[in-house]
């Protein structure tokens, strides 16, 4: 109606109340958490291809061994041509890099040794996939972590941030030291990530 388009995939029952999802705009593929609060479809995403056309969808096994739902799904716009690289966070603080998600996914766990067992709320990607900023949305934990080597080493980037949940993060595309954080107390910014 009025130029809008919608299509339903019937008989699907998956995901959480607000399931994290992200869209690979280069390959026209939507990825979304498939695991429900009840544990159905563990360690899976929903992958929907050809949006706006003859859509094709299905469950996609990730092979991470995770029994909980994914709390964050992030598509990397820096994925090699013709491929989808995803970052998946869990409610238990684990982080995975998934390559080749458009076909047969390959996973690498890049969870930091000191990450809290907490809800991983966002992954921000800098001007390369070596530069990542990860946030957690729990009280009583270090909520902001950064890496400049693709997840081999992680360091706290919380600085003087109070003990508040961080919901989302953005890195400035031309300067990985500049970040915005969406928190329960508003938007915080820094230009001195190290």
PLM segments and residue spans:
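Residue-level signature of beta-propeller blades and closely related beta-rich strand-turn architectures
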Residues: 35-37, 92, 101, 138, ...
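Conserved Ser/Thr-centered positions that define the repeating blades of beta-propeller domains
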Residues: 1-2, 21, 33, 41, ...
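Beta-rich catalytic cores
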Residues: 16-17, 69, 82, 119, ...
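Surface loop/turn motifs at the tips and blade-to-blade linkers of beta-strand repeat domains
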Residues: 10-13, 61-67, 112-115, 159-162
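Residue-level detector of Asp-centered blade-edge/turn motifs that repeat once per structural unit
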Residues: 23-27, 75-82, 125-129, 171-176
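Loop/turn-rich, solvent-exposed surfaces of beta-rich toroidal or solenoidal domains
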Residues: 134-143, 160-192
């Amino acid at each position: 109606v009025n130029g809008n388009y919608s299509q339903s995939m019937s008989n699907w029952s998956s995901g959480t109340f607000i399931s994290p999802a992200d869209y690979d705009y280069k390959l026209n593929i939507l990825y979304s958490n498939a695991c429900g609060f009840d544990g159905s479809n563990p360690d899976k995403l929903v992958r929907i291809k050809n949006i706006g056309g003859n859509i094709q969808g299905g469950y996609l096994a990730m092979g991470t061994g995770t029994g909980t739902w994914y709390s964050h799904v992030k598509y990397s716009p820096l994925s090699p041509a013709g491929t989808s690289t995803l970052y998946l966070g869990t409610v238990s603080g684990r982080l995975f890099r998934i390559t080749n998600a458009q076909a047969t996914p390959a996973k690498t766990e890049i969870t930091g040794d000191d990450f809290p067992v907490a809800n991983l709320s966002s992954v921000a990607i800098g001007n390369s996939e070596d530069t990542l900023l990860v946030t957690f949305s729990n009280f009583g934990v270090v909520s902001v972590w950064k890496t400049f080597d693709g997840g081999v080493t992680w360091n706290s980037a919380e600085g003087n941030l109070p003990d508040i949940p961080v919901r989302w993060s953005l890195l400035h595309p031309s300067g990985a030291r500049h970040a915005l954080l969406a928190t329960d107390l508003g938007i915080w910014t820094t230009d001195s990530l190290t």
